[in-house]
Amino acid sequence: LIWHLVQQSNLMSNKNFDTLIIGSGLAGFTLALHLAHTKKICIVTKQSVDAGASSWAQGGIAAALSTNDSPSKHVQDTLIAGAGLCDEAITQYIAENAPRAIHWLIDQGVHFTSDHSNETGYHLTKEGGHSMRRIIHSGDATGKAVQQVLIEKIRSHPNICVLEHHIAIDLITSDKLISHAASSHKQCFGAYVLDKQKDKVYTFTAQNTVLATGGASKVYLYTT
């Protein structure tokens, strides 16, 4: 149905990908590397690929890695600290999958601060709200350490295209292309993307479009 609608609309595509990822932070990078072994991926980023907020994350990543810790303890600490604002299902999912995510980062080549006196082999710290030492880190620049490794992986992967200084200005959706498209079949085909250096708009089509542009910082007028 998706490509049938595209053909009906006479949409001219400059580039076509299996997955279009808008945003070049750790979320977008991680998804790209997981998909790229079988898919053609494009990452669009409005500045240079290393200019996002991910590199500014300092403290570390929480994961229940020690034998005396567990995802259930991690969940309990998070729900208490969240004071009723946490989505319990999402909290459970993140806590259960955090150790696996850490091991994946290590496999990619991320060097976390070591501590041979710890059973895990890594230095774990304890931050506010946590009842256990479960913060794994890379010095005091964890985000930067992770980002640098993933950027190297991204740039060297033959199935990943990175377009810097490109900004998505609108999503291409079925309701915009075909006025009589059934609402139940509403889909996204890609995005119109502005090349900021050439001042030219291109049409990028994709079977899947992912928004990985960071937090919703404009939900409130002022944020800290």
Model-found features: residue ranges?
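Core beta-strand elements of the Rossmann-like FAD/NAD(P) dinucleotide-binding domain
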Residues: 15-17, 199-208
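Conserved N-terminal/central alpha/beta ligand/cofactor-binding core
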Residues: 45-197, 212, 218
